[in-house]
Design a protein with these regions (language model features):
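Hydrophobic side chains in well-ordered alpha-helices
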Residues: 2, 38-46, 90-93, 97, ...
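FAD-binding subdomain of flavoenzyme oxidoreductases
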Residues: 1-52, 56-57, 83
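Short, flexible, solvent-exposed loop/turn segments with mixed acidic/basic and small polar residues
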Residues: 15-23, 58-77, 121-132, 157-163
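Extended, compositionally biased intrinsically disordered regions at domain boundaries
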Residues: 1-20, 64, 87-133
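A conserved active-site cap/scaffold subdomain adjacent to cofactor or substrate pockets
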Residues: 32-33, 41-111
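Short beta-strand-to-loop capping motifs
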Residues: 31-35, 81-87, 139-143, 171-176
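Structural motif
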Residues: 9-10, 27-29, 53-56, 78-80, ...
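Conserved glycine-rich FAD pyrophosphate-binding loop
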Residues: 104-200
Length: 200
């Protein structure tokens, strides 16, 4: 029976079925990093590689306890790189990226799709800062200047993590006055970047 046929039986001679492409998957390669400079190197190489990552972030050691995943077995600072696509393509590209970065198996962990999604949702939502009551800033600089900027502002007792493959520094500072904020702005300006106050 067809709609509007008033009970008349009909024969379908041709049927067109519209299908949607299968939803892509993702995994996250997590690398144990002892040094910020090495982490920035990994981010830079990853974003310019043929593995085509869709996310690249670095968390210092002080935020390590914010992530408790079954698949995350490493300690200390972490660099996380997300790869999206078909399952077979993802695994191949992660292997290729590990070879390009020259990292060993005992230095990495792989977050499977479900845990990978949670990790990146927490990153987008700035969850590591959710229980902190300090001032929150968004710093954007060329990736080549990130290390220098962090070296100069660390005297302000900053808590931070790095997103956008090295160009975005989310920064939390407990106590800051007008003089300190002006100095930080000047440091960032000299690094060809800018600062946005999110909460103060």
């Amino acid at each position: 029976l067809l709609c509007g046929s008033f009970g008349t039986l009909t024969v379908l001679t041709e049927v067109a079925v519209k299908v949607l492409p299968k939803q892509g998957s993702n995994k996250t390669l997590v690398i144990e990093n002892p040094h910020l400079k090495k982490a920035l190197e990994y981010l830079n190489i990853s974003l310019s590689s043929s593995s085509d990552p869709s996310g690249a972030v670095f968390y210092p050691e002080n935020f390590r306890n914010n992530f408790t995943f079954n698949d995350l077995t490493i300690n200390g600072p972490i660099t996380a790189i997300r790869i999206e696509g078909s399952p077979g393509s993802i695994d191949h590209r992660i292997t290729s990226l590990c070879n390009e970065l020259k990292i060993k198996k005992d230095e990495i962990a792989i977050l499977e799709p479900e845990q990978s999604n949670i990790f990146w949702e927490n990153t987008r939502g700035l969850k590591v800062f959710s229980n902190l009551k300090g001032n929150l800033f968004k710093i954007v600089v060329p990736g080549t200047n990130t290390f220098d900027v962090l070296s100069k502002i660390k005297k302000f007792d900053v808590k931070y993590f790095i997103d956008w493959g090295g160009s975005l520094i989310w920064t939390q500072i407990d106590k800051i006055d007008a003089k300190s904020l002006k100095e930080i702005r000047e440091i960032i300006k000299n690094a060809e970047g800018y600062l946005t106050v999110i909460k103060i």
